[in-house]
């Protein structure tokens, strides 16, 4: 399963994990220490992606095609 993130900058990322799991990672980072990033895996490239939880505008389950 993948989840789409849209940041306040307009950047879009498709990351591994269902929406609830990705939401939990983002919330945990937001509640963590100052400037803690949410570490995710970009679905297409398998690269690590660090996201500032304060910059997430939209999180939604990606459609499977």
What are the language-model segments listed below?
Residues 1-65:
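Eukaryotic intrinsically disordered, low-complexity regulatory linkers and tails enriched in Ser/Thr/Pro
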